[in-house]
Amino acid sequence: MAFPSVTSVTVENVTFPPTVKPPCSPNTFFLAGAGVRGLQIHHAFVKFTAICVYLQYDALSFLSVKWKTKSTHQLTESDQFFSDIVTGPFEKFMQVTMIKPLTGQQYSEKVAENCVAIWRSLGIYTDSEAEAIDKFLSVFKDLTFPPGSSILFTVSPNGSLTISFSGDETIPEVTSAVIENKLLSEAVLESMIGKNGVSPAAKQSLASRLSHLFKEPGVCDPQSHK
């Protein structure tokens, strides 16, 4: 199902539809938010990827309990709000579409660096996470991503991270790899929208769209999602 206010979002000529069905899940997810990821290089802001985050509909009833009375600004400024999205007991789906070309090594090493930094700051970097990072890097090792190609992640509450690839903006029917590590699955999303997330624009989009959805009649009723 889709609610009237769940619309598509266009980021740098990449249009993310209101709903998707990931290749490894029987569920349809709604578009929670999207934005650009870029870096300030000298005096120019260089845009590298367009990032979107989809959530299972159950996320609305879970998140609204604590956050439905908050404004968009309050949600945007709250690290705990984004932490609740990252760790919540519902599926998440992220799509990263290239604006600039990147190699698999360039992309995966930066993500891995961000994940390890998160774990070290929390004192939870163990051999299990180091092994998961090695698996993550190996999935991307020999790949290249031209503009318009996409990397897709599905995060399951049971702790699995499913990785898929697409030559364009479409959702593939097959998966490329599954890594069973809960901390890694959460850290990949955390690196996008967490406290030091790489896409402030995506965070702003999430806060705005979810703030409005929380206030829609019936949206936060779990029965309305069945």
From Swiss-Prot:
Query: In this UniProt entry, which residues are annotated as the site Important for catalytic activity?
Result: 107
Known role? Catalyzes the intramolecular cyclization of bicyclic chalcones into tricyclic (S)-flavanones. Responsible for the isomerization of 4,2',4',6'-tetrahydroxychalcone (also termed chalcone) into naringenin.
Pathway(s) per entry: Secondary metabolite biosynthesis; flavonoid biosynthesis
Protein EC:
5.5.1.6
Q: Where is the signal peptide?
A: none
Annotated organism of origin: Glycine max (Soybean)
- Note from the entry: Part of the biosynthetic pathway for all classes of flavonoids, a large class of secondary plant metabolites, many of which are brightly colored.
Example of a GO MF term: chalcone isomerase activity
Instruction: Give the reactions, separated by semicolons, that this protein catalyses.
Output: a chalcone = a flavanone
Q: Which family does this protein fall into?
A: Belongs to the chalcone isomerase family.
The name on file for this protein is: Chalcone--flavanone isomerase 3
Gene3D superfamilies the UniProt entry points to: 1.10.890.20, 3.50.70.10
Q: Which Pfam families does the annotation name?
A: Chalcone
Binding positions (substrate): 49, 114, 191
Which Gene Ontology biological process is one annotated for this entry? flavonoid biosynthetic process
Which enzyme class, named as a word? Answer: isomerase
Q: Does the keyword Isomerase apply?
A: yes
Alphabetized UniProt keyword annotations: Flavonoid biosynthesis, Isomerase
